[in-house]
Regions:
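Terminal-appendage/accessory-domain detector
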Residues: 1-193
């Protein structure tokens, strides 16, 4: 879960996690390139007092996946935000507008929300610059989104249902024709624990 303008920055940071995870203390700086709207709406410095502040801060949304390799709803809560590495990384970030990203954001044929992230280390080395133009689920990446949505459904629903109930729901969802023929009240009954 990430604010719209930061979704691709989060994906770039998750890609970089394996490269930086053992070197977080060695980071000199982090450059985030974004669209004008991203700079205007989610480039935030200073204290972030609550989850609503954090989910509208591109620096926070990049720091978490760089450190932990994930960004979940729980990562916006106080316990995760209290990790001193988060603010230490935020302080090392420079957010800048990439004019091409802004142009592509405003282009109705593209509607990209591109971001790029690159990490620079104290020893002078750096990661690759990871650029992601469109988030998973964008019309150009729709196919990549289906497995992600299916997994999100499994992760959200299966722990709340008994094994037999989950298996029945899973079997129904796997059969498109049977699912389409199922009355809404019968389907909803499968979701009640």
């Amino acid at each position: 879960p990430a604010e719209f303008h930061a979704q691709t920055a989060v994906e770039a940071a998750m890609t970089l996690h394996e490269t930086v995870r053992g070197r977080v203390d060695d980071i000199e700086s982090i450059v985030i390139e974004t669209q004008e709207a991203g700079v205007r709406i989610i480039d935030k410095t200073g204290p972030l007092d609550n989850p609503a502040d954090r989910d509208h801060c591109i620096q926070y949304m990049v720091a978490i996946p760089l450190i932990f390799g994930r960004l979940t709803a729980a990562d916006y809560e106080d316990g995760v935000a209290a990790d001193p590495r988060v603010d230490a990384l935020r302080d090392k970030m420079e957010v800048r507008e990439n004019k091409q990203f802004t142009k592509d954001y405003l282009d109705p044929k593209k509607r990209y929300i591109a971001n790029a992230v690159q990490v620079f280390f104290k020893d002078g080395s750096s990661t690759d610059r990871i650029e992601v133009s469109a988030p998973i689920g964008h019309r150009e990446r729709r196919g990549e989104g289906i497995p992600v949505l299916e997994q999100k459904f499994v992760d959200s629903v299966s722990p709340r249902l008994g094994a037999g109930q989950w298996e029945a729901l899973e079997a129904l969802c796997a059969d498109r024709d049977k699912l389409a023929a199922t009355a809404v009240d019968d389907f909803m009954a499968l979701l009640v624990a």
